[in-house]
Amino acid sequence: MGSGPIDPKELLKGLDSFLNRDGEVKSVDGISKIFSLMKEARKMVSRCTYLNILLQTRSPEILIKFIDVGGYKLLNNWLTYSKTTNNIPLLQQILLTLQHLPLTVDHLKQNNTAKLVKQLSKSSEDEELRKLASVLVSDWMAVIRSQSSTQPAEKDKKKRKDEGKSRTTPPERPLTEVKAETRAEEAPEKKREKPKSLRTTAPSHAKFRSTGLELETPSLVPVKKNASTVVVSDKYNLKPIPLKRQSNVAAPGDATPPAEKKYKPLNTTPNATKEIKVKIIPPQPMEGLGFLDALNSAPVPGIKIKKKKKVLSPTAAKPSPFEGKTSTEPSTAKPSSPEPAPPSEAMDIDRPGTPVPPVEVPELMDTASLEPGALDAKPVESPGDPNQLTRKGRKRKSVTWPEEGKLREYFYFELDETERVNVNKIKDFGEAAKREILSDRHAFETARRLSHDNMEEKVPWVCPRPLVLPSPLVTPGSNSQERYIQAEREKGILQELFLNKESPHEPDPEPYEPIPPKLIPLDEECSMDETPYVETLEPGGSGGSPDGAGGSKLPPVLANLMGSMGAGKGPQGPGGGGINVQEILTSIMGSPNSHPSEELLKQPDYSDKIKQMLVPHGLLGPGPIANGFPPGGPGGPKGMQHFPPGPGGPMPGPHGGPGGPVGPRLLGPPPPPRGGDPFWDGPGDPMRGGPMRGGPGPGPGPYHRGRGGRGGNEPPPPPPPPFRGARGGRSGGGPPNGRGGPGGGMVGGGGHRPHEGPGGGMGNSSGHRPHEGPGSGMGSGHRPHEGPGSSMGGGGGHRPHEGPGGGISGGSGHRPHEGPGGGMGAGGGHRPHEGPGGSMGGSGGHRPHEGPGHGGPHGHRPHDVPGHRGHDHRGPPHEHRGHDGPGHGGGGHRGHDGGHSHGGDMSNRPVCRHFMMKGNCRYENNCAFYHPGVNGPPLP
């Protein structure tokens, strides 16, 4: 073709002699000439013209001629070129032409056209081209499937026809073959083994096959012998199946007629050739019995046999190679195989015809490359297989061995460049070995490096270059209005101050219920509530006075000691404190039940003895101070901090007159005249019966005798067990382990409410509300739980829980829980526990315990202890007398008898097991059970 542009019309005119009116090629010669022109075509126009001519050609002969001449290969070249140049129109035209050509499997195997088309169907960018390629691929797949299935079937049919002809023509040869079979009996044994394998799958049919083969083999053998004369006889000798079968038939030859009768009905179904076989079969009467049964059952199990044949395929395959080896030499072995095939046909009669599969199976294996050779090899193997096979229209599986030259098959796979590949996937063993070596090396290096790694810097630190960043164009929050709103809000709102880490707010008021809670002996710090047990007792009874008992019975000392040791809070003194405690107790009191505690208390040197024995062990903290009371501050053991360490009492004489006589209750010198007594009571006189409670101190200060106390000259009660607070007070004077937690100040919002630790707020805004210990605030509200206190500053209220106190300055109220108190200044009110009374000070009034709380910043929470007696103010406002002892004034105050779980008659409760066994109880005064002689009368 010229290098200039091509006019398709001129090209068609030049080809007019080869084309008809529709553009179709007229003859086979014309297509060969057109093919020669196509090879010279270089322009796309000419190529498209030739492709359109092929599309118009309908004659399959002409198209096949084009393929044979080399047109298919030429189209492959064009397809490859157009694919590389991505010429979509030309690709579409080529694909249409390929779809139009009658290609076969052999053609597709010649080159990689099919692979190129498949790649186009997957990776082409043009959707139409992809669809066209996928359609072409599906068409070719259908061709491959159809040819692979149809070709073997056609070959089988041809073989069957040939076998039938050979069977019908030579009936006499079987006798000669029988002789040959008698010569070689060993071969028949081998054959029998084959049927046995078949029997494994279908025993009844196996019998039928064996019988049918034996009878039919002679007829079949002669037929094939006619075709293959002497060679056939030799090969038949190799196949002694008929010999054995005939020998077997000879033994039962007497019963031949019945066998014939039985076989005739079977023969009626087969063709005339099968009838001939039936006549030959009669010599097998003995086997016929089982054979007839097999035949009768055969038609029904025929379908089942198909399944069984599938199973048999492996077993049958094993014998087939055996025969194949024997008969592989000449293709004439086919006659032997066809002869046995007729017996198999008899079996086929029972089992609706299964195609002779020996040939088909090899074709399946060889369809790709060994079709002609496979046919030859198949007949060789078929002799054994056909006998075992049935004609049911199904392929028979078998094993064949192709010739030496055809043993190798090559399959070519082209990599689709666009296909995604797993890069990490190991492709071959060599790569896997390399990877393993690298991984081992890496693991070894890391292990070695880690073993000697001292975590030291090996590379000197180099300060990185500072990055110069441009200033931000927009300042964050520059236009925010919310920040101004927040600033205005903060101007009018107090800052939230969290003085205690545990809780930022005041604790909620805890309502006290008369129901005693359950004892859960956890850590000593948080084992008990403020008012764990409440009991109502008679006020009289020296031994039964609850508070007096709680503070005057000896076992409370033991309770203090044991409490300081319990729950992992041993004394801070020597390690052997526990043993010393036991020795001290035994030396002092012997048995708690042997001597009444009051007798011990009356001993003049009893308190000194206790002090001398306890202080060296650190059980009472440091030695006595000015007034003989050890401070309960942080220096002492945690469990002993029930004496506030705050400043001295602001008012002279709240705890005893400065010049008054001091009875043996005090363990040291009298308190200094002003503020020298920062504690309510000393260790031997913790809460009830100090000079301020029961001491006869005649000084100007008021005194208050403890409930149930004896009087100023009576021996002091032992100290009660300390409360172990869980939280420290808020104001400066509070103990770290006060129990009361944070509290609001009476005056300025700061509150000190330790459970038992002392604390005196000297400042104006601190309230002191210790649970048991005293404290005095200069300008503060003092709310000790049990002990008295006095407030000097204005606006301070003294609200001891149980003990008395006097508010000296104006505006102070005295609200003892059960003890009396007088408001000395204006606005001071005395609100004792229960009974009415008149306050000597102005606007002071008595308010019973159980009434509503006192108004103001802090309400008074009643103790809920029943049995409180009212107060009578007979003497001066600051003089209150207990119900038993004489008072300075003319008035007596009768304290309540139900202790704050430090007294109380528990005799109606079960006796404490620990107390009876050990002589002490870790919960001494807080124990819910009866301690004889401590929280109730001693046992009789």
From Swiss-Prot:
There is a cross-link at residues 179, 262 (Glycyl lysine isopeptide (Lys-Gly) (interchain with G-Cter in SUMO2)). Residues 418-619 are annotated as: Interaction with WDR82. GO terms for cellular component: chromatin; chromosome, telomeric region; nuclear body; PTW/PP1 phosphatase complex. A motif (PP1-binding motif) lies at residues 394-423. Keywords: Chromosome, DNA-binding, Isopeptide bond, Metal-binding, Methylation, Nucleus, Phosphoprotein, RNA-binding, Ubl conjugation, Zinc, Zinc-finger. The modification Omega-N-methylarginine is found at residues 665, 693, 739. The keyword Phosphoprotein applies. Residues 393-408 are annotated as: Necessary for interaction with PPP1CC. Phosphorylated on Ser-398 by PKA within the region necessary for interaction with PPP1CA. It is found in: Nucleus; Chromosome. One of its GO terms (molecular function) is zinc ion binding. Residues 644-655, 714-723 have a biased composition (Pro residues). Residues 147-211, 247-270, 304-400, 533-905 are annotated as: Disordered. It comes from the Eukaryota. Residues 357-433 are annotated as: Necessary for interaction with PPP1CA. GO terms for biological process: negative regulation of cardiac muscle cell apoptotic process; negative regulation of mitotic DNA damage checkpoint; negative regulation of transcription elongation by RNA polymerase II; positive regulation of telomere maintenance; positive regulation of termination of RNA polymerase II transcription, poly(A)-coupled; positive regulation of transcription elongation by RNA polymerase II; protein stabilization; RNA polymerase II promoter clearance. The modification Phosphothreonine is found at residue 256. Component of the PNUTS-PP1 complex (also named PTW/PP1 complex), composed of PPP1R10/PNUTS, TOX4, WDR82, and PPP1CA (or PPP1CB or PPP1CC). This is Serine/threonine-protein phosphatase 1 regulatory subunit 10. The gene is PPP1R10.
